[in-house]
Amino acid sequence: MVERCIEIASKRFTDIYRYNISEGLWLAGKKQTKKTPVDPLEMLDRILATEHKVKYFERSLFILEHFDLVLENQDPYLLTKLKLITEWRCHHSAVVIMGRPYLELPEIISDIPKLNVAHIDENDLKEMLSACDPHIPEDEIRDLTDALKGLSILECQNLISLSLAKLKRLDKDFITNQRTSVLCERANGLIELCEADIDLNSVGGLEALKTWLLKRGRFFKGRSPQTESRVPCPKGVILTGPPGCGKSALASALAGSWQVKLVKLNHACLFSSLVGQTERNLTIALETVKALSPCILWIDEFEKFFPQIGDSTLDGGVLSRSLGLLLEFLQSARDGVFVWATTNRLQSLPQEIMRAGRFDAIFFVDLPNRGERTSIFEILLGKYVPEVDLKGRESLLDATEGFSGAEIEQAFIDSLYECAESEAELDEFTLLRTLKAFIPLSRTLKEDIDSLRKWCVSRARFASCSEPFKDRERREPCPMSQR
């Protein structure tokens, strides 16, 4: 980036100086040895002195490298001198401060214009690839350019060199996998790359939701070229319902069906005790997700993301500012990023989040009905004991009334342990005995689940084809659920 800046500046400035706290201040492009380290205050004094000595036709540029490390100390003398430099009346010199992306400047110099240039320009990237292999086809250059997007110049050079060293060629899949690892490491644990080794057929039931997702799959701009340019890219959904009903499993299944990455936002690492660090973490996480597109952004337990959002006196307004950043992200053009937000308490979400336009729909994922439990048993049998035939056993369907999909699977696994200990084959009676001893959450949290179900009647679309209400005609349509 420094070399690129010098290349552009050489057309406008007569002298270009570089500075860092290790090597001092020196004239760029000269062969003489760099000077000994110079104190930042002394360096700023030299810049101020230079302004009064240069001739009217001379212009100097000072590039301060890694200067964000110096600004962290909030030295009042240093900040005051920088402020004096910004208030020059005769602009014979200019100063460029280089630091990490999303640098927050102290208030006294906050009026300095900021430009985030974290990624390499596409034309520069094509030149770099052509220099490695002059005979590379144009379509391969385009694919490799997409595979390297979101990286800095040095990171691109490293991945290209690694591909050539290991495979003796520029391999798109290898570079894409390495790029994903680099971006996730850059996020410092704020996001997590999850496995997406199943598809929508691996999840039992929820046919209405799966049909809705399949209709929008071909319009996901990160996945395939668009023929209908007027149809916008799907933005995302909010899923609510009792725990264990498949909200999280569907995220992995959708990523597998759409053949894109599944990225989980780790809100446990997001919040920090340092002032401004939480907002910075959220910004870094969301920008990294954009760089990883096409992908599905999974925000699990969404209700825990904004606890007590209305009371800003308890946290100094951190949660309110975080909400503002997230709203800006949801409202912006984010083609190639599908947000999958799951929550057990839809009522506790801020109303701004649920406004139409930020998500495509709100779905209520209820406990599986009889037909869905049949599908779940078929999937579990094929997964664990394909040689056993328990299909169509009405007693099992009766015994699992009120069970979630996760509870059915756990009871199934418990039965396998019982059979392994007695060296017997899994049968209907073993499963029934295990199910009888199992206490589902629908019994433990009956009041909470009933309350959530009734609350969602006129506020969400049902993920299953059949609704568990006899008085469906009384249901008022939810404007957002009809989209």
Regions found by a protein language model. Give the residues of each.
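N-terminal accessory nucleic-acid engagement/regulatory domains that precede
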Residues: 116-120, 124-166
